[in-house]
Design a protein with these regions (language model features):
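Short, aromatic/basic amphipathic alpha-helical patches
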Residues: 67-78, 240
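Boundary-proximal intrinsically disordered activation/regulatory segments immediately upstream
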Residues: 1-68, 156-157
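RNA substrate-binding interface of SAM-dependent RNA methyltransferases
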Residues: 5, 106-210
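Anion (oxyanion) recognition and catalysis
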Residues: 49, 75, 196-197
């Protein structure tokens, strides 16, 4: 039976993870090994459990306990289940709960780039992408369209922030990922060198005079390719483009010269992930 606890005190410290800690505080939780993230909705939580992530506690509407969340709860032993009606939960968290369920989970230590890229042939590299919706959408496309791994630079949005996890529909738990470089100063020079040492050719998604079409046969022939996508608005840094082996453009019509980075990633993964 679930360990159900009716909420009577909004100030209870065990509710801090849902109501009062910032994303940065959740991520560090004083020490990296104590980091926490929030998964939202039964389907997303189930995918996290499938991937081996460990639950800490739940926050949900009462009706969810015997409804859509029941299968997830059956997998989680005695994890505390804090509950109230929807209006009270919205007052506590400051937002409407999607499908009425949140789960605080332990954040694992990140694997190394070498571990994530072992046996990988196509990887996505995300530079400075700060919008959590874009991060979630890119991870969903990466999982669906044949990317073997995703690498994020230190300036990227956290892939395990609540909105990114929700938008990804939990696919952030299905595709291997890690951070490339410990600090922003490690990218692009050290990060690119690491990719080249691992045998990857690098392809910058950018529009320059030297860009080749995304359907260029040379790209498809590369045994190991890292597809590098840049921040919203400004795109990739000039130093990143210069460090890449290829600069790649997506042919477009009606005078359009660029796509949102999430849309561009889906096109790139579809075309370049056919291996």
């Amino acid at each position: 039976m679930p360990n159900v606890i009716e909420i009577t005190d909004f100030a209870a410290p065990e509710l801090d993870v849902y109501a009062r800690l910032t994303q940065a505080q959740l991520r560090s939780r004083l020490e990296p090994e104590k980091g926490i993230f929030i998964a939202e909705s039964p389907k997303v939580i189930a995918r996290a459990l499938d991937a081996g992530y460990q639950p800490i506690s739940f926050l949900m509407e009462r009706k969810q306990i015997t409804g859509p969340a029941s299968e997830v709860l059956a997998r989680c032993g005695n994890a505390p289940v804090y509950t109230a009606d929807r209006a009270m939960l919205a007052q506590l968290t400051g937002f409407e709960l999607t499908r009425g369920v949140l789960c605080a989970m332990h954040r694992p230590l990140l694997p190394t780039v070498e571990e994530v890229c072992r046996n990988a042939r196509r990887v996505a590299v995300l530079e400075g992408i700060v919008d959590s919706t874009n991060i979630g959408a890119i991870f969903r496309s990466a999982a669906a369209l044949n990317m073997d791994a995703v690498l994020v630079t230190p300036s990227c949005c956290d892939p395990l922030c609540r909105r990114a996890v929700r938008v990804s529909m939990g696919t952030v738990f299905q595709v291997p990922w890690t951070q490339i470089g410990s600090t922003a100063a490690d990218w692009p020079e050290q990060g690119m060198q690491q990719l080249h040492t691992l045998g990857f050719k690098t392809a910058a998604m950018a529009l320059t005079d030297l860009s080749v079409s995304i359907d260029d046969a040379a790209l498809a022939a590369e045994p190991k390719l890292a597809i590098v996508l840049g921040t919203e608005g400004d795109g990739l840094a000039h130093t990143t483009i210069a460090a890449c082996d290829y600069t790649v453009r997506i042919p477009m019509s009606h005078g359009v010269d660029s796509l949102n980075v999430a849309a561009a990633s889906a096109v790139a993964f579809w075309q370049l992930g056919k291996h």
